[in-house]
Amino acid sequence: MSRTIFCTFLKKEAIGQDFQIYPGDIGRRIYDDISQEAWSLWLNKQTMLINEKKLSMIHHEDRALLEREMIQFLFEGKDVHVSGYIPPKD
């Protein structure tokens, strides 16, 4: 059974996460306030960051960078910018 939450990212009612997908207090905040749709948008941005910046999840600094970018994207309204990336034209 899916849960409906008010997604603070999308600013509308949406289907919430099925379980806490990230550890700690940030994970609880994501579970409570971020919809599946918004999380999917973040995962696309995360993949772009990992690929373009050649991040490795083995390195603590790279994981910390991703977490900072995730918080800024999901909770502070800041988009992810990757130098050299040009979005496709519609």
Curated annotation (Swiss-Prot):
Pfam families: Iron_traffic. The keyword Iron applies. One of its GO terms (cellular component) is cytosol. Coiled coil: none annotated. GO terms for molecular function: iron ion binding. The keyword Iron applies. InterPro entries: Fe_traffick_prot_YggX, Fe_traffick_prot_YggX_sf. It comes from the Bacteria. GO terms for biological process: cellular response to oxidative stress. Keywords: Iron. Could be a mediator in iron transactions between iron acquisition and iron-requiring processes, such as synthesis and/or repair of Fe-S clusters in biosynthetic enzymes. Belongs to the Fe(2+)-trafficking protein family. Monomer. This is Probable Fe(2+)-trafficking protein. It comes from Hamiltonella defensa subsp. Acyrthosiphon pisum (strain 5AT).
